[in-house]
């Protein structure tokens, strides 16, 4: 039987739904409709129902969804009913900012090690973590059962660091900038390029003008 392929956009929206639902729960709201979720996150009610339908039947027709239960189901789908230990490679400006980003902790991602090969950075502390040399990665990965790594190094070093992390049996990597990393098929890599996000914004700013010309 062929495995069901879940669109990545659906997974992204599930994360957005969960945050919206958590805000409702904080306000004491116990039941919500697909229309209310859709309005709150900027999609159609049909899209909400379709995204949830990939994973089963949720809610009651004419009543809606139990907010607490739906939060639990979505967090379970996203693998967020347990904490995840993460290491960060690169203690420069980006790495420092990521290490102190509260949003990771709030979603259950705990940075347990920060690494760099720059002798001027090794030994310094970022928040409550000491910057360690790359040679210490295997030790920390094993000690904390790390599955995920964030790579925040110069573009020319990303592939080398990715190779080292894969060699240490990590299967999930997050990278930054315009770089394509070559990894084995069983390793998941996701890239964040902030310049691309800005280009999407500029496209939307000029789209109406371009459309009128075309």
Swiss-Prot record:
It holds the Pfam family Put_DNA-bind_N. Keywords: Cytoplasm, DNA-binding, NAD, Repressor, Transcription, Transcription regulation. SMART domains: CoA_binding (SM00881). GO terms for biological process: negative regulation of DNA-templated transcription; response to redox state. GO terms for molecular function: DNA binding; DNA-binding transcription factor activity. It is found in: Cytoplasm. The keyword DNA-binding applies. Residues 16-55 bind DNA. It comes from the Bacteria. Disulfide bonds: none annotated. GO terms for cellular component: cytoplasm. Gene3D superfamilies: NAD(P)-binding Rossmann-like Domain (3.40.50.720), Winged helix-like DNA-binding domain superfamily/Winged helix DNA-binding domain (1.10.10.10). NAD(+) binds at residues 90-95. Homodimer. Modulates transcription in response to changes in cellular NADH/NAD(+) redox state. Belongs to the transcriptional regulatory Rex family. This is Redox-sensing transcriptional repressor Rex. It comes from Desulforudis audaxviator (strain MP104C). The lineage of its organism: Bacteria, Bacillati, Bacillota, Clostridia, Thermoanaerobacterales.
């Amino acid at each position: 039987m062929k495995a069901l392929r879940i669109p990545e956009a659906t997974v992204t929206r599930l994360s957005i739904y969960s945050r919206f639902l958590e805000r409702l729960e904080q306000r004491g709201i116990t039941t919500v409709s697909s229309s209310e979720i859709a309005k709150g996150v900027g999609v159609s009610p049909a899209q909400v129902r379709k995204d949830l339908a990939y994973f089963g039947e949720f809610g009651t027709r004419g009543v809606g969804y139990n907010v607490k239960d739906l939060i639990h189901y979505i967090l379970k789908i996203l693998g967020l009913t347990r904490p995840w230990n993460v290491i960060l490679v690169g203690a420069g400006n980006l790495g420092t900012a990521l290490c102190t980003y509260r949003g990771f902790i709030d979603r259950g991602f705990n940075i347990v090690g920060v690494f760099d090969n720059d002798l001027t950075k090794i030994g310094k502390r970022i928040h409550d973590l000491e910057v360690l040399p790359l040679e210490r990665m295997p030790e920390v990965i094993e000690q904390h059962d790390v599955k995920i790594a964030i790579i925040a190094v110069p573009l020319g070093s990303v592939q080398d660091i990715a190779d080292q992390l894969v060699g240490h049996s990590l299967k999930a990597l997050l990278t930054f900038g315009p770089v394509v990393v070559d990894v084995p098929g069983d390793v998941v890599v996701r890239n964040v390029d902030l310049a691309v996000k800005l280009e999407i914004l500029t496209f939307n700013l000029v789209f109406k003008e371009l459309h009128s010309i075309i």
